[in-house]
Design a protein with these regions (language model features):
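Acidic/His-rich structured neighborhood in mature extracellular/periplasmic domains
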Residues: 100-172
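Bacterial Sec-dependent N-terminal signal peptides
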Residues: 1-35
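Membrane-targeting and insertion segments and their boundary/processing signals
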Residues: 31-35, 55, 123-131
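Start-of-domain marker
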Residues: 33-100, 111-113
Length: 172
């Protein structure tokens, strides 16, 4: 990478621009995402369907949950909230791309001054139904809920973040 410095005497703005470019390339970006979710899609009950749809769903959901910044808070990588979503597909309609599932959602946090973690949240959701077509891109808009899948995961993401924050201090 070649960085060209601009002569200060001819262009005072050039030095500011050059310094900003240097900071952009030198200063590491901090992680802003709050969650580190593991998502498991169990599709053993579904026969005769290409397994790639379930693999794609798992990868897409992990990317959606882990790479989205859910709040304005800044979390370092080691501060991210550990959580898991174990989704068991009980029925899949490939004509409508409808998944009927049950899900176990769990979140943990470290115990102060120890190497242990404790469970913050553990729930089984027996009515976890959504539509997903292979290679769908998941977009979430807080002001307009138009996708049941993103709404479900956003609900649990915000719930987990809120419970985690309350575990450190009342009202986060």
């Amino acid at each position: 990478m070649n960085i060209k410095f601009i002569n200060i005497s001819t262009n005072g703005i050039g030095i500011v621009f050059s310094m900003m470019l240097m900071l952009f390339f030198i200063v590491p970006k901090s992680a802003a995402q709050e969650l580190e979710a593991k998502i498991n899609i169990n599709h053993n009950q579904i026969q005769g369907t290409d397994a790639s749809i379930f693999d794609n769903l798992q990868q897409t959901l992990e990317q959606f949950v882990n790479e989205r910044q859910w709040t304005n808070l800044k979390f370092q990588k080691n501060e991210r909230i550990q959580c898991s979503f174990n989704v068991t597909v009980t029925k899949y309609d490939k004509n409508t791309n409808t998944f009927t599932c049950k899900a176990q959602v769990q979140a943990n946090r470290p115990v102060y001054n120890s190497a242990y973690t404790t469970t913050l949240y553990n729930n089984v959701d027996n009515d976890f139904t959504f539509q997903f077509a292979q290679f769908d891109q998941l977009e979430f808009n807080e002001e307009n809920i138009d996708n049941q899948l993103t709404a479900l995961f956003a609900y649990y993401a915000y719930l987990i973040i809120g419970i985690n924050l309350d575990s450190f201090a009342p009202m986060g």
